[in-house]
Amino acid sequence: MNKPILRVLRGEALPVPPVWLMRQAGRYLPEYREVRAKAGSFLGLATHPEWAAEVTLQPIRRFGMDAAILFSDILMLPWALGYGLHFAEGEGPVLPKLEEADIDRLDFSQLIPRIAPIMETVTRVREQLQQLHPETTLIGFAGAPFTVSCYMVDGGGAKEFPRTRHFAYTNPEAFDRLIARLTEATITYLSAQVEAGAEVLMLFDSWAGLLSPLSFARWVTAPARQITAALKARHPSVPVIGFPRLAGTLLQNYASETGVNAVGMDTSVDPAMARKMVPAEIALQGNLDPLALRAGGEAMRREVSSIRQAMAGHPHIFNLGHGIVPQTPPEHVAELLNLIRTI
């Protein structure tokens, strides 16, 4: 396949890097807000294949991104395991605070039927891309077990997830059990996405940087290695991108020990240093500050130029260091793509 992102994930450095953006389908787009209003709720949108496929494709139509990423959420996995999830307006995800007894109550029997609408979305998007945008790669994704566990144990978003970390330190065997169950479910979930049409998989470990090096090895690197190995055994041609956000120097361990094809860099990572830390064949993805994108203009141009120079000659997918913020003018995204493709 000659798709630019697949070429980079095979270890090829392209003169113009392919580009897609985390949260490229989202509230900054007026067409997204229209569909979201129709759906009435985030879950109503994420579990409606027609609408979810539509918002997945919106940034492809508008900007010509090199990849479409499934419109969903990292917490759809606990939802599919029967673990209560709702999105409170203005507050984000809310879940019951997990206790040890809840670990064995996670309902694997409902996983496949509950993810069926999400898989239908993947299939719809892949079919439309093949017809209308054949150079565009479809990315499926999941939250990594540690990050998903953070939301489950703390009961939603929390500053530095103190309850999760306390639970992990004081009851490591139980926490191991939770991570193991989520690892198993993640393999099933991501494998189903490939079977439905995903060409690349991404593992988001948004809170990996909260852990000590010892805990990082146990609850970030080891599960990522297990997930990647299982997926490559089932789907040898499907590349995996890992994103251990805020991992700092532990990015090196993650890149060399997990088997991923590419590593996502958050905004704090110096791309020139990242190149030295990862094996030459491992692609890097990132890492423009989303606030530089929001600002646009000269500030954005300086940052883009710096990243491009640092990554010249290395396999690179241009992206952000975190998701697009809702206040971003769509014109700035168009300006970014023009900038990347004309430098």
Curated annotation (Swiss-Prot):
Keywords: Cytoplasm, Decarboxylase, Lyase, Porphyrin biosynthesis. Its main location: cytoplasm. The gene is hemE. It is an enzyme of class 4 (lyase). The record marks 73 as: Transition state stabilizer. One of its GO terms (biological process) is protoporphyrinogen IX biosynthetic process from glutamate. It holds the Pfam family URO-D. It catalyses: uroporphyrinogen III + 4 H(+) = coproporphyrinogen III + 4 CO2. This is Uroporphyrinogen decarboxylase. GO terms for cellular component: cytosol. Substrate binds at residues 23-27, 73, 151, 206, 322. Coiled coil: none annotated. PANTHER family: METHYLTETRAHYDROFOLATE:HOMOCYSTEINE METHYLTRANSFERASE RELATED, UROPORPHYRINOGEN DECARBOXYLASE. The keyword Transmembrane does not apply. Pathway: Porphyrin-containing compound metabolism; protoporphyrin-IX biosynthesis; coproporphyrinogen-III from 5-aminolevulinate: step 4/4. Its EC number is 4.1.1.37. Belongs to the uroporphyrinogen decarboxylase family. Homodimer. It comes from Granulibacter bethesdensis (strain ATCC BAA-1260 / CGDNIH1). Catalyzes the decarboxylation of four acetate groups of uroporphyrinogen-III to yield coproporphyrinogen-III.
